[in-house]
Each structure stands twice: as structure tokens, then as C-alpha cells.
Amino acid sequence: MQSWNLMEIDTPEGSRSPVVLHSEDGEARAVLIGLKPGQRLGDHQVKEAAMLVVVDGAVDVEAGAERVSAGLGTVLRFDPDERHSVSTESGARLLLVLAPWPGAGHYRGSAAR
């Protein structure tokens, strides 16, 4: 068993320094994202099904024509390749779970040398 206290993990650079909590090929990837007040994750998509959990604060999420204001405890789910954006006025802490990891067509890159 592994466990994490999501409120105690430091994310000093906000969205520029997400913290990968767990990543296992064929399974899932869990990432903690801290957003500072006014930060935004612009329109993007991922190859995996994604679940986004608001751990602290509040965010506004747009996906296509839908817009949701999501507060503490809200869980949002996105299909693979579904475009979406996330923004916060007051700051937020989010848990992102991607599964299966990596998704079909996910860019693998090459190892650093």
C-alpha cells in the first residue's frame, strides 16, 4: 500500500511543477497539481481517460460548450482526447488520474542521455 497526504505535498511553482505521485505502465498515473491564484491550464487534451478531483480551492472548467464551477470534493471525468481548460481565481489543488497509462498514441519520447 502507498499513501499520500495531498495537503502536505509542496507544489512551489504551481502548474509549472506538477508532482507525479504514481506512474505504472498499463495501470494509471496520479499527478498532484497546484494552481496559484489566477493560474490557468489552457485548452488541452490527453490520450488517456482523465479524472480531476478538486482537493482544495475552486476551479472553473470548460470542455466544449460546457462550463462547470467546481469546488472542494468535486470529481470531473474527461474522455480520451476531450479538449478542456481549467482556471482558478483563488488558487486550487487538484489530483489528476490518467488511465490506462500511457493511453494509446501517447508520445513516449526518448530517455535523456
Regions found by a protein language model. Name each.
Residues S15, R29-V46:
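Conserved short histidine dyad/triad with adjacent acidic residue
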Residues A58-D60, R67, R83, R93:
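Structural motif
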Residues V55-D56, G71-L72, S90:
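A cytosolic small-molecule/anion-sensing beta-strand core signal
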Residues P80-A104:
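Ligand-binding loop in jelly-roll beta-barrel domains
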Residues R40, V75-R77, R93:
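Residue-level marker of beta-strand positions
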Residues G64-D81:
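Short acidic-glycine-tyrosine-enriched beta hairpin
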